[in-house]
């Protein structure tokens, strides 16, 4: 009889909420800083790890943006994405839908083309050599203006075939989805799939706004949906997925501790919830560690872990045929 940890390791899984910049491990950060002669405010890898003690989304974002400064060349972005794909292979992540934040890089003088070419070359190699399928989702930084978002949308159009969808991330409170309503209308016209972070630090009204104002196909986080019973019922009825990130929620104190997390409660109610790692280099765990945490702290059963893995494919942007191919392997 395999243990739950062994079951998690063997389960085919999709990851739908992963920021590629958030997979930058301290070792690679140091290596790229030396190569590119970028000064870091840390003397060692250990010092960086110690600095990863955040108490809020904002304190995390401060170090996240500082770390991203080491990414300058196409090969840097390739190395970053390739390192994540090797983790995927080790954890039996068969499909991944990756967020990237072009504004984090274009604001530093790195071209959109440099970012997208480096990442997509790694993704192409990942499909060919590792058998991992993937899609790219471009995120707009919500603490910036909508007009800046329009500039990035324009920059993305020559690379339209490399980007499946668009999302919305960064500091949530004070930057509701409605701030970007016109931008997301244009994104829909361009044929992009639509997702958005909502209901992590922002209340349930942010989730409603993402649904009605942005017309999202998926909600990233969404854990505060339980503040509104009508919203929970809507999510169940429409089967709009939530890409939940348990270890991230605890690290950023959106949830006090894992034993209080609502992911399994939502699953049992019939909400289409999935498990994801968010920014794993910063939050102390990749996808399997998030599944293991649910087993350890919430006593997730074998059937619940399998249901979450099935949901990861159901909630993906894969074709129905490919979704079923993976789901059959889990059932």
Swiss-Prot record:
Zn(2+) binds at residues 17, 19, 197, 278. Keywords: Hydrolase, Metal-binding, Nucleotide metabolism, Zinc. The keyword Hydrolase applies. The record marks 221 as: Important for catalytic activity. GO terms for cellular component: cytosol. GO terms for molecular function: adenine deaminase activity; zinc ion binding. Pfam families: A_deaminase (PF00962). Transmembrane segments: none annotated. GO terms for biological process: adenine catabolic process; hypoxanthine salvage; nucleotide metabolic process. Belongs to the metallo-dependent hydrolases superfamily. Adenosine and AMP deaminases family. Adenine deaminase type 2 subfamily. NCBIfam families: aden_deam, PRK09358.1-6. This is Adenine deaminase. It comes from Wolinella succinogenes (strain ATCC 29543 / DSM 1740 / CCUG 13145 / JCM 31913 / LMG 7466 / NCTC 11488 / FDC 602W) (Vibrio succinogenes). The lineage of its organism: Bacteria, Pseudomonadati, Campylobacterota, Epsilonproteobacteria, Campylobacterales.
């Amino acid at each position: 009889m395999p243990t739950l940890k062994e079951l998690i390791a063997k389960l085919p899984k999709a990851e739908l909420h992963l920021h590629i910049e958030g997979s930058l491990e301290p070792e690679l950060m140091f290596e790229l800083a030396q190569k590119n002669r970028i000064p870091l405010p840390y003397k060692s890898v250990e010092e960086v790890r110690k600095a990863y003690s955040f108490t809020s989304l904002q304190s995390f974002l401060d170090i996240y943006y500082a770390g991203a400064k080491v990414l300058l060349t196409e090969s840097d972005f390739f190395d970053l994405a390739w390192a994540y794909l090797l983790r995927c292979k080790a954890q039996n992540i068969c499909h991944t839908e990756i967020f990237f934040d072009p504004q984090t890089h274009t604001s530093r003088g790195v071209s959109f083309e440099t970012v997208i070419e480096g990442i997509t070359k790694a993704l192409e190699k990942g499909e060919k050599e590792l058998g991992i399928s993937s899609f790219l989702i471009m995120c707009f930084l919500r603490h910036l203006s909508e007009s800046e978002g329009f500039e990035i949308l324009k920059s993305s159009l020559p690379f339209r075939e490399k980007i499946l969808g668009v999302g919305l991330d960064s500091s949530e409170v004070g930057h509701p989805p409605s701030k970007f309503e016109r931008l997301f209308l244009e994104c829909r016209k361009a044929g992009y799939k639509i997702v958005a972070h909502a209901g992590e630090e922002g209340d349930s009204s942010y989730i409603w706004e993402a649904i009605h104002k942005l017309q999202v196909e998926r909600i990233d986080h969404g854990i505060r949906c339980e503040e509104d019973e009508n919203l929970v019922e809507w999510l169940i009825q429409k089967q709009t997925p939530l890409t939940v990130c348990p270890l991230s929620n605890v690290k950023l104190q959106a949830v006090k501790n894992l034993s209080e997390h609502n992911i399994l409660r939502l699953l049992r109610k019939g909400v289409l919830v999935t498990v994801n790692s968010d920014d794993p280099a910063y939050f102390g765990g990749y996808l399997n560690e998030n599944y293991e945490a649910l087993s350890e702290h919430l006593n997730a059963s074998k059937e619940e872990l399998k249901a979450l893995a099935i949901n990861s494919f159901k909630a993906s942007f894969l074709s129905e045929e490919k979704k079923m191919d993976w789901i059959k392997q889990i059932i």
